[in-house]
Amino acid sequence: MPRSSFQKLKIIYIMEYLLKNSDEDHAVTTSQIIAYLKSHDITAERKTIYSDIDALRDFGLDIIQVSEGNNHGYYVARRDFELPELKLLVDSVQSSKFITHKKTLSLIKKIEKLASIHSAQLLNRQVFVKNLSLIHI
């Protein structure tokens, strides 16, 4: 029987954490994953994290393990959209003449969710289009 009602969701929370917080420049450790799970009232041990990451790999998530000395980390290497593609989408939305400012902000927030939190910061750009006001996100 699960220790908490969320225990069965552990692997989904691990996937969410990896997608949101890791990229090639920002690997996450098993300790960080365990702390994240604990914040959601889910208990986990290192060995179960390793097996859950293997299961996510089997599912098709491209998770890379990196090692620096005694520190081991993981990051999601391949995503549906690469950062330059997301920048292109953001620029296209910002420069569109028929999308309202409110809808532009909403769409950009959704596009940012397709990247890690670190890469999403790089999507905050300014685009100036003739006959449109400056849009800064």
Regions found by a protein language model. Give the residues of each.
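Bulky hydrophobic/aromatic content
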Residues: D80-L134
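Short, basic/aromatic recognition patches that contact phosphate-bearing ligands
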Residues: M1-L88
